[in-house]
Amino acid sequence: MARRYTALIVCLVALACLATTASGASSFKSSVFASGAGIFHTTPKGREAISFPDDITSLGGDIYVAFQNGVGPQGQASTTGNLDSTVVEFDAAGHAVGQWDLAGKCDGLTAEPQIGQVIATINEDAHSSLYLIKPGGTAVHYAYSRPLPSKGGTDAISVYHGLVLISGSAPGTTGAAAPQARYPAVYRATFNTTAHTVTMRSLFGDEARAVVANTGADRGQRVRLALTDPDSNEDVPAYARRFAGDFMLTSQGDQEQIFVSGAGRAHQSLSVLKLTHSVDDTAWPSGPTGALYTTDNSGDKIYKITGSFARGSELAAVTPCDQNNAPSTCPGPGFPANFLGEINPNTGAIVRVALSGPAVQPQGMLFLAP
């Protein structure tokens, strides 16, 4: 019989977990890859520099970053009256070679190599929509064919074995408070390129059943999820140390990662890994060389992190202030600013990864092999 999954205590002392450093982490170095400071877009009050980088993806050798420019989670105007996010295309040297303004707050960004375009979701809390961006061309707006049944917005996007999967973020914003069994946690998106609409169907719901993945007495038990904050998602690579080939959803405030085996098939199965801290984006290095690119929303920069990576390790942007139990004044004691961490895929414990170079508060993350 399924039961609700209560917090699994992985670390007895949270502060001790925060202080721990991943072995070999001192070999990692950060450097500034790009900044929005010298890139401008037009607003009702004139030209202003773009700001608040968030999601990040790559296509055709270039890197694409969504700058939210202070727009609110339902598309509300920034303090300067701006209503648009800006997606910027950077070349390998960090030079801006293209940009597109999108109406609303861009929260999700991913490449669709099959069509050679970038997909962007708009407004994480409500009044959501979507854009397809053609490199060297225009951004085309798409509306959802029906109101989202999760009564919220949309966030991260993954292309998983040909399926476009989108997180149903901020469930219950315009309806009953989450969790609700009828609220989709992840949507399958189907595009009508003639009508410029997207049909959204549930992949699984906020109260779907899953198997506990953490090592310990509860491992293997079936539980009912109670997701309140579906956020980032990923296609777990085949070389990952665990959950290889799965689709993964991060429920940020709930401190959980949901792994879906056989996503989209008739007999898909879910596993839940409880984390010691909340996380945003996750990346799995493919080998010791390459680079991890991460946005820093607080510093308006994109950083490049290099070093000797462990193949298949699970790196994450750790976001203590986004936990459901975070204090209203944050950062604060026990709730530091964002940091780069490594997740133990068996226990869910997170250790801090030490960096030399400029301080980084990671958010969106992307690993690129050489």
PLM regions and their residue ranges:
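Bacterial N-terminal signal peptides that target proteins for export
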Residues: 1-9
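A detector of low-complexity, intrinsically disordered, Ser/Thr/Gly/Pro/Ala-rich segments
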Residues: 4, 18-19
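Bacterial N-terminal signal peptides
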Residues: 9-18
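Sec/Tat signal peptide C-region and signal peptidase I cleavage site
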Residues: 20-24
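Sequence/structural signature of beta-propeller domains
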Residues: 25-370
